[in-house]
From Swiss-Prot:
GO terms for biological process: dGTP catabolic process. Transmembrane segments: none annotated. CDD domains: HDc. One of its GO terms (molecular function) is dGTPase activity. Residues 1-38 are annotated as: Disordered. This is Deoxyguanosinetriphosphate triphosphohydrolase-like protein. It comes from the Bacteria. Belongs to the dGTPase family. Type 2 subfamily.
Length: 423
């Protein structure tokens, strides 16, 4: 395997499953763009329809709630940016880590995790549904870009290292240690075996670990920011012992690795930060808005820089890539991030109005799924109709239905339901 002395990645990392013909549309006398393989991969994800659809898919609150909502797309952009900054400090390829951030939620269905739950119910007898496995399926087959010699879709035909950087759960359903999450379906096991060739079993590459931590940081900090702006979260609860104890109790039930005492200590540390105190009772004034933005910026820096420093201390100097290091995050920092997640859970996701809305969303997905199946292939988009017609059994046909719904934006799903499948 060829490795440039200045490039810590080798030809094996840059290999694609399907060989691609040279481009032919360039003008005579011109040269193609001088881009790395990972820069090309990043561009493929950036220009994909699946990424654009995330603009109309829920992060925490719906994409049409409020004037400046966070969607799955804006969240993915934030994860990509945080990950890229961490890659600078660790010596990972910047395009590779940014790509992983952009693609980490590309398989999410309408209504985010709530939609995942509904589609998992729809496909329960046929392998279920998982957003992370759908990420892999989109990148390796569903998103049109490259065909193999038999005319089958190879998806975006990303390099091995790029695909591996998106895999947070490198196993199939039921194979993961202590988690129900999984990274690919049985249907995609050949592609997964190709990507994971030579990789340590059950272990994420460093670039995927960076993406995963960037996801945690973005989710915890920015979703709390949205909660503060919407007046659902008041950060002063962190300094109230009774409120903090209630959050710690909830957190202990949600995070098995973080105890109540750890949550209480995290609340004391965060509430003592000047940037937290400066937000106070948010009132949307200029001063309050600036204070909140400074808070989010400083917390992102706090959590990202802690991971960089701790990893460097353990792994030493030089480029840290692929399986040459493990991302190390201090336990106290993990507790702080977990506490912010609990704030969003307590004051946003546990709101009875939010839960009622979610119940209606799941019903809609079930309704549309059965309407699609009953009328298939007529009710499906052409690509999915062809897949339905050639499906070998009922399980494969239901997988097509799930793929179709997962591809919908929330607006399209709701229009279809109102027009065809509604009561």
């Amino acid at each position: 395997m060829t490795r440039n002395q200045h490039d810590p990645y080798d030809d094996f990392d840059r290999q694609r499953r399907v060989a691609e013909a040279p481009k032919t549309a360039g003008l005579p006398g011109t040269e193609g763009q001088h881009r790395t393989d990972f820069a090309r991969d990043r561009a493929r994800v950036l220009h994909s329809a699946a990424l654009r659809r995330l603009a109309d898919k829920t992060q925490v609150v719906g994409p049409r709630e409020g004037d400046t909502p966070r969607t799955r797309l804006t969240h993915s952009l934030e994860v990509a940016q945080i990950g890229r900054g961490m890659a600078v400090g660790l010596g990972c390829d910047l395009d590779l880590v940014e790509l992983a951030g952009l693609a980490h939620d590309i398989g999410h269905p309408p209504y985010g995790h709530n939609g995942e739950r509904a589609l998992d119910e729809v496909a329960a007898a046929y392998g279920g549904f998982e957003g992370n496995a759908q990420n892999f399926r989109i990148l390796t087959s569903l998103e049109p870009k490259v065909l193999d010699a038999q005319g089958n879709s190879a998806g975006l035909n990303l390099t091995r290292a790029s695909l591996d950087a998106v895999i947070k759960y490198p196993w199939r359903r039921g194979e993961g240690p202590g988690t129900s999450k999984f990274g690919f379906y049985d249907d995609d096991r050949e592609a997964a075996a190709w990507v994971r060739a030579g990789a340590p079993a059950g272990r994420m590459c460093l670039e995927a670990q960076v993406m995963d931590w960037a996801d945690d940081v973005a989710y915890s900090v920015h979703d709390v920011e949205d909660g503060v702006v919407s007046q659902r979260i008041d950060l002063r609860v962190l300094a109230d012992d009774d409120e903090a104890a209630a959050l710690a109790k909830l957190g202990e039930s949600e995070f098995s690795r973080v105890g109540a005492d750890d949550f209480m200590a995290a609340a004391r540390r965060l509430s003592a930060l000047p940037v937290v105190a400066a937000v106070g009772k948010y009132d949307a004034t200029l001063a309050s808005s600036v204070a909140l933005k400074r808070l989010t910026s400083e917390l992102v820096g706090r959590f990202a820089s802690a991971a960089i420093a701790t990893t460097r201390a353990a792994a030493g100097p030089g480029p840290l890539v692929r399986y040459r290091a493990e991302l190390a995050v201090p336990d106290l920092v993990r507790a702080e991030v977990a506490l912010l997640k609990i704030l969003a859970l307590q004051f946003i996701m546990s709101d009875p109005r939010h839960q009622q809305t979610q119940a209606g969303q799941r019903e809609r997905i079930h309704r549309v799924a059965h309407w699609l199946y009953a009328g298939a292939p007529r009710t499906l988009d052409p690509v999915f109709a062809a897949a339905f017609n050639t499906a070998a059994d009922d399980g494969a046909r239901w997988r097509v239905i799930v793929d179709q719904i997962a591809s919908y934006t929330e607006g399209r799903l709701e229009r279809i339901d109102a027009r065809q499948a509604g009561p």
